[in-house]
């Protein structure tokens, strides 16, 4: 068993002002994606200024934060937030939904694409390889918060999380997700997108791979207590929300390559 590193959730405290690691990880993720986007901009929209890129980052960040929070409220714990709506604003306590954030990014990207004369899927193919940076940073934030831990196990890398009332050795599922959704997904998309691909193929690969990775990790992750398992004694809300991503991502890639083949003839 590995010891859980005791990290204060507050990264910086200046009097009454407290900066939590969870929020800081979001800033690091957005900043890292911004930096990488600037490096890739010449191949996507050489006519865009850095100010235009900053506008895009703002819209994407808005979609991530607003969509992620509202998605968690709607998908995972609506009764609690209806009982005390002030909890919606307490983002530092955790409670962000990737799938809600994805919907927020899709909406904001659609608005941005229409305003700037870019195709929606063309823009999404540019954004997709940047997303794993934020996902990886967010999972580190979950780990520091000692939340979203996994099921009990006797594996040598199991950890006892301070927030676990049972104090059992558990899968560090946040680190599994960091490795898959952050590191592995970034590597796959980065190398795949280095060559020209059919429009929609990169974003389709993102949806497919994320859906598969998340679906797998959910088997060792403890489901949200207020939801439990939705069906079959194992299906979680996360897995249910990933099924459309897996099917949709595979369909997007198939359609993209078929369309390219038709145009080639």
Curated annotation (Swiss-Prot):
GO CC, any one term: plasma membrane
Major site of localization recorded for this protein: membrane
Pfam families: LGT
Highest taxon above the source species: Bacteria
Pathway named in the protein's UniProt entry: Protein modification; lipoprotein biosynthesis (diacylglyceryl transfer)
GO biological process: lipoprotein biosynthetic process
UniProt-listed Enzyme Commission number(s): 2.5.1.145
Subcellular location: Cell inner membrane
UniProt keyword Transmembrane helix present: yes
Listed GO MF terms: phosphatidylglycerol-prolipoprotein diacylglyceryl transferase activity
Keywords attached to this entry: Cell inner membrane, Cell membrane, Membrane, Transferase, Transmembrane, Transmembrane helix
Record field: transmembrane: 10-30, 56-76, 87-107, 117-137, 172-192, 200-220, 227-247
UniProt-listed PROSITE patterns: LGT (PS01311)
Keyword field contains Nucleus: no
Functional description taken from the UniProt entry: Catalyzes the transfer of the diacylglyceryl group from phosphatidylglycerol to the sulfhydryl group of the N-terminal cysteine of a prolipoprotein, the first step in the formation of mature lipoproteins.
NCBIfam families, per the entry: lgt (TIGR00544)
Family: Belongs to the Lgt family.
Name of the protein this chain belongs to: Phosphatidylglycerol--prolipoprotein diacylglyceryl transferase
Species: Azotobacter vinelandii (strain DJ / ATCC BAA-1303)
């Amino acid at each position: 068993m590995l010891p859980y590193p005791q990290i204060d959730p507050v990264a910086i405290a200046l009097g009454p002002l407290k900066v939590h690691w969870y929020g800081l990880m979001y800033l690091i993720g957005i900043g890292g994606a911004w930096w990488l986007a600037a490096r890739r901009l010449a191949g996507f929209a050489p006519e865009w200024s850095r100010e235009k890129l900053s506008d895009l980052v703002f819209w994407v960040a808005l979609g991530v934060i607003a969509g992620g929070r509202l998605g968690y409220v709607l998908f995972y714990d609506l009764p609690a937030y209806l009982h005390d709506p002030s909890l919606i604003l307490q983002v530092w306590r955790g409670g962000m939904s990737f799938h809600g954030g994805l919907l927020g990014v899709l909406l904001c990207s659609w608005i941005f694409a229409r305003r700037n004369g870019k195709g929606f899927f063309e823009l999404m193919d540019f954004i997709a390889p940047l997303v794993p940076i934020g996902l990886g940073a967010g999972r580190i934030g979950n780990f520091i918060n000692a939340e979203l831990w996994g099921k009990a196990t006797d594996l040598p890398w199991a950890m006892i999380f301070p927030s676990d009332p049972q104090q059992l050795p558990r899968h560090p599922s946040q680190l599994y997700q960091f490795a898959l959704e952050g590191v592995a997904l970034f590597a796959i998309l980065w190398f795949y997108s280095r060559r020209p691909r059919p429009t929609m193929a990169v974003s389709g690969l993102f949806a497919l791979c994320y859906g598969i990775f998340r679906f797998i990790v959910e088997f060792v992750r403890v489901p949200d207590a207020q939801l439990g398992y939705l069906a079959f004694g194992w299906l979680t809300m996360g897995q249910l929300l990933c099924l459309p991503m897996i099917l949709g991502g595979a369909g997007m890639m198939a359609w993209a390559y078929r369309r390219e083949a038709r145009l080639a003839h």
